[in-house]
Swiss-Prot record:
Involved in phosphonate degradation. Keywords: Aminotransferase, Pyridoxal phosphate, Pyruvate, Transferase. This is 2-aminoethylphosphonate--pyruvate transaminase. InterPro entries: Aminotrans_V_dom, NH2EtPonate_pyrv_transaminase, PyrdxlP-dep_Trfase, PyrdxlP-dep_Trfase_major, PyrdxlP-dep_Trfase_small, SP_NH2Trfase/AEP_transaminase. Its cofactor is pyridoxal 5'-phosphate. The lineage of its organism: Bacteria, Bacillati, Bacillota, Bacilli, Bacillales. It comes from the Bacteria. The gene is phnW. Belongs to the class-V pyridoxal-phosphate-dependent aminotransferase family. PhnW subfamily.
């Protein structure tokens, strides 16, 4: 039984274990050798989760939300004469476009509907037509809807056409197995408060060493300079350039240990997958249909279409919160939806309790 005051059925921040919370009861010094050694262990563990070819990759930790780490990559990796192709079918792809435009980076957009995956044929067409494209960015799990994008195919095109590939794996890393060396991903970005099941406070970039070295002097921001952050961590045994979120780092280290204890990414994926499958089946029993086609659906978060006219999400939200659950509103404009997350310290009995509450009358029409 989860001991939280309510269960977060969200894509992060999410419900964490009691033991992850407990390690944050102590204070730590950013200059302490024990703390910086832990930072180095975290960096190494993340690379080992990402690939079996660990010598080719390194990890950079970056203060702030996951978006800070995405912007650090966009602002540091793409040179002044570079051009970025962004595959977008949701809010987080659009955010990358916004970053590029704010940073005055030339950007090309491959746009699909929010419930449809990235169109590989269109991506290749754009690469063939525009030889000036140097980088490709794609969101793995677009939590706007819960759709999974075909990063294997996107990365193959990146390799085929000689482009640097950037994968926003914010809501998938640690919950879906991938090997970034096999896929030839150059920069993968995620966050502490997603599938690793830590708390908010920093993001991280797992970067191909050869590509990261090319970023020296390219940063468009002092605090978000990816290369400078990495160089300091490398040369000073895990030290961050500016004040690091010490409590969050300790919680994340504990979360990594708990991921290992659970059986690794494959075991966690299986739990998330079973949660999501049960959720869709049980929600179907009470009249809710998922937005995304089953073959494109992630195990991370599920969008459900409003069941009828007059359905009031806010009333449902308030009632479920009274029962001890927090869910997410929808985030797309063309279809009325709401979202339920399957990740965090969430188990099948939690999913059953949620739907039982809705079946008993928490569904407000």
């Amino acid at each position: 039984m989860n001991e939280n005051h309510y269960l977060l059925l969200t894509p992060g921040p999410l419900t964490t274990t009691k033991s992850v919370k407990e390690v944050m009861l102590y204070d730590w010094c950013t200059w302490d050798d024990e703390y910086n050694t832990m930072v180095q262990e975290v960096r190494a563990k993340l690379v080992s989760l990402a690939t079996k070819e660990e010598e080719k990759y390194t990890t950079v930790l970056m203060q702030g939300s996951g978006t800070f780490s995405v912007e650090a990559v966009i602002g540091s990796v793409i040179p002044a004469n570079g051009k970025l192709l962004v595959c977008t079918n949701g809010a987080y792809g659009k955010r990358i476009v916004q970053m590029a435009e704010m940073l005055q980076i030339d950007v090309v957009i491959s746009q699909t509907e929010e419930w449809e995956p990235t169109n590989i044929v269109e991506v290749e067409k754009l690469l063939q037509e525009d030889k000036e494209i140097t980088h490709i960015a794609v969101v793995h799990c677009e939590t706007t809807t819960g759709i999974i994008n075909p990063i294997v195919d996107v990365c193959k095109l990146g390799q085929q056409y000689g482009k640097v590939t950037i994968v926003d794996a914010m809501s998938s890393f640690g919950g879906i197995e991938i090997d970034i060396a096999d896929l030839q991903i150059d920069f993968l970005i995620s966050s502490a408060n997603k599938c690793i099941q830590g708390v908010p406070g920093f993001g991280f970039v797992i970067a191909k060493r050869d590509e990261l070295l090319k970023c020296k002097g390219q940063g468009r921001s002092l605090s978000l300079d990816l290369y400078d952050q990495w160089e300091t961590m490398e040369k000073q045994n895990g030290k961050w350039r500016f004040t690091s979120p010490t409590h969050v780092v300790h919680a994340f280290y504990q979360a990594l240990l708990e991921l290992e204890k659970e059986g690794g990414v494959r075991a966690r994926y299986n739990r998330y997958y079973n949660n999501q499958k049960l959720l869709v089946n049980r929600m179907g029993e009470i009249g809710f249909k998922p937005l995304v086609d089953k073959k494109y659906q992630s195990p991370i978060i599920t969008s459900f279409i409003y069941p009828k006219e007059g359905f009031e999400f806010q009333q449902l939200y308030n009632e479920l919160k009274r029962y001890g659950f927090v869910i997410y509103p929808g985030k797309i404009s063309k279809v009325d939806t709401f979202r339920i997350g399957n990740i965090g310290d969430v188990h099948e009995e939690d999913i059953n309790r949620l739907v039982d509450c809705m079946a008993k009358g928490a569904v407000i029409g």
